[in-house]
Amino acid sequence: MAASKKAVLGPLVGAVDQGTSSTRFLVFNSRTAELLSHHQVEIKQEFPREGWVEQDPKEILHSVYECIEKTCEKLGQLNIGISNIKAIGVSNQRETTVVWDKITGEPLYNAVVWLDLRTQSTVESLSKRIPGNNNFVKSKTGLPLSTYFSAVKLRWLLDNVRKVQKAVEEKRALFGTIDSWLIWSLTGGVNGGVHCTDVTNASRTMLFNIHSLEWDKQLCEFFGIPMEILPHVRSSSEIYGLMKAGALEGVPISGCLGDQSAALVGQMCFQIGQAKNTYGTGCFLLCNTGHKCVFSDHGLLTTVAYKLGRDKPVYYALEGSVAIAGAVIRWLRDNLGIIKTSEEIEKLAKEVGTSYGCYFVPAFSGLYAPYWEPSARGIICGLTQFTNKCHIAFAALEAVCFQTREILDAMNRDCGIPLSHLQVDGGMTSNKILMQLQADILYIPVVKPLMPETTALGAAMAAGAAEGVDVWSLEPEDLSAVTMERFEPQINAEESEIRYSTWKKAVMKSMGWVTTQSPEGGDPSVFCSLPLGFFIVSSMAMLIGARYISGIP
C-alpha cells in the first residue's frame, strides 16, 4: 500500500542548531511553525588537561552535513519534497573559538570551547593593565574580562600555537566563532566561502563595540588581535550565501543567531521586559531591554539580542549566564557512573523527592553570573552516611534551579520590575521534576512551550524573514500562538527561602579553591584562615562518600 501523502501548507525553512553537546538539523513549516522532521548527532568534547575543553571543528562540520542529509531522507519518507526548503538558519554555541587556514580550509587547532579555563593567567595579566576595574572592556562590550569570551581564547592561540602564528604572519588565518566556521565552510570554503558572523555572535567575542556595532580598534589593540583575521559582521537576518554541497545545494543561508539569542526569538520575546531561560549545557536567562543598552549593577552581562535585517534596529538584552546546567548530568553519567543515560536522573530524583540536606555547587569552570569568580570549584556538601546517589541526583537538579534563582534575583534588581513568570526552553525542560523544582525555588510559575525546539525555531524564523526569502512574517499578528505547559509553586515561600539561603552558604564554600586571592567582594579572612586539617578531613570524607555511593567495599 502506498504511503499517504502528507499535506505541506506553505514553504519550509531549515535550521542548523549546533550546540556544545550535539548538532541538529530541523525543518519547520513557515506558516504554522510546525516541526516536521529533524536529526541529531552527539558531539565529543575533549579534556586534554584540567580546565581545558576542546572540540574538533571538522567533526562539527561533518555532523552538520550528516544531520542535513538524514533529515532530508526522513522528509522523503514523509513524501515531503526537499525543494520546499527555501532557506536555512544557523544557531550555535557562542564564544567557542576556531582559527583556520583559508587556503587549505583546515583548522589550525581544535575549537577552544566557551567553558575552557586555560586563559585564566591571561585574564589576570590583562586585568592589571585595565584602569577602573575592567570598565574599559565592559563599557564597550557589556562583558566582564573573563575566560568565557573569545578574545582571550584567540590571544592564547596566537601565543601558544605555532601553526596559528605562522598562518597569521602569512595572511592565511581566519578567525571565527562556530557560526563563522560553518557558514564559511557551507558556502564554499576555500572556493569562495563567505567569512562572516552576525551581531549576536560578534558581541560575545570581547572585541565588538555593542554601541557602534563594529569591531573596536582599541579593543583589538589591547588584546593584540590583528583585525584582518576577523569576520565581516552582518545582521541576524539576511542572505549570507548559498549552500554549495549536499542535498540542499543552492538553498540560501539567511539567518544566524547565537543560540541564546535564537531562543529569545523562538520564544517570541520581542517586547521590552520579556525574558526566557534556556536549560542546555549551561543555563542562560535573557531579558529584552529594547534599543537601550542596560548595564547591570548585579553581575549580569549586556549583550546584543538580535538585529533582524540590515536596515532593522538592534535590540539588546541583559543576560545571566550559568556555566554548568545540563553538563552536570553528563558529568554524573560519564565521570561518576551514577547514571547510564541522562534520562535516568529524573527517575533517581523522584525516588527520594529531596536532597536530604545535600547541596551540590557544580562550579567546574568557576562561577559565572552573578559572581564571575574563576577561583571557585565544584563541591558536594552536607553529606551523611544516609546520603545515596538519589540524593546527589536530586541535589544536581536543585543546583540548576538555585543558580537560575540567583540570576533571576539579579535581573529583577537591575530591571526594577520582577518577572511574574519564567518562560523556559532547552533539552532539560523535558524533566518534570526539574521544572517543578524551578517553580518552587523561584516561587513564581514556570511556563514551557510544548514544542521545545525554540532555539532552532528562532534561527528558522530569522532565515525565513530575510529580505529576498520572505517566507516567514515576524509581524505580531502573524506569529503562531504557542501552547504552554505551566508549573505552579507547590511549597510555601518560607521553605523556598530556607533552601535558597542554605544553597548560598554552599556557594561561598566553593570559592577561593585555586588562587590565593579572595573572591571579589568576599571576606579574605574566610579563605586565608582555613587550616590544613580541614582539607585533610574533607578530602577523606569525600573519598569515603564516593566509595560508599559506588558500592566499593
From Swiss-Prot:
Output the InterPro entries linked to this UniProt entry: ATPase_NBD (IPR043129), Carb_kinase_FGGY (IPR000577), Carb_kinase_FGGY_CS (IPR018483), FGGY_C (IPR018485), FGGY_N (IPR018484), GK1-3_metazoan-type (IPR042018), Glycerol_kin (IPR005999)
Its pathway is:
Polyol metabolism; glycerol degradation via glycerol kinase pathway; sn-glycerol 3-phosphate from glycerol: step 1/1
Q: Which residues does the record give as substrate binding sites?
A: T20, R94, Y148, D259
Cited SUPFAM superfamilies: Actin-like ATPase domain
The terms under GO molecular function for this entry are: ATP binding; glycerol kinase activity
Q: How does it sit in the membrane?
A: Peripheral membrane protein
EC number(s) for this protein? Answer: 2.7.1.30
Family annotation (Pfam families): FGGY_C, FGGY_N
Q: Which GO terms describe its biological process?
A: glycerol catabolic process; glycerol metabolic process; glycerol-3-phosphate biosynthetic process; triglyceride metabolic process
Which locations, inside or outside the cell, does it occupy? Mitochondrion outer membrane; Cytoplasm
Q: Which reaction does it catalyse?
A: glycerol + ATP = sn-glycerol 3-phosphate + ADP + H(+)
A GO cellular component annotation here is: mitochondrial outer membrane
Q: Which UniProt keywords apply?
A: ATP-binding, Cytoplasm, Glycerol metabolism, Kinase, Membrane, Mitochondrion, Mitochondrion outer membrane, Nucleotide-binding, Transferase
The organism's superkingdom is given as: Eukaryota
Residues annotated as binding ATP: R24, T281, G326, G427, M428, T429, S430, N431
Family as reported in the entry's similarity comment: Belongs to the FGGY kinase family.
Stated role:
May be involved in the regulation of glycerol uptake and metabolism.
Name of the protein in its database record? Glycerol kinase 3
Q: Which species does this protein come from?
A: Homo sapiens
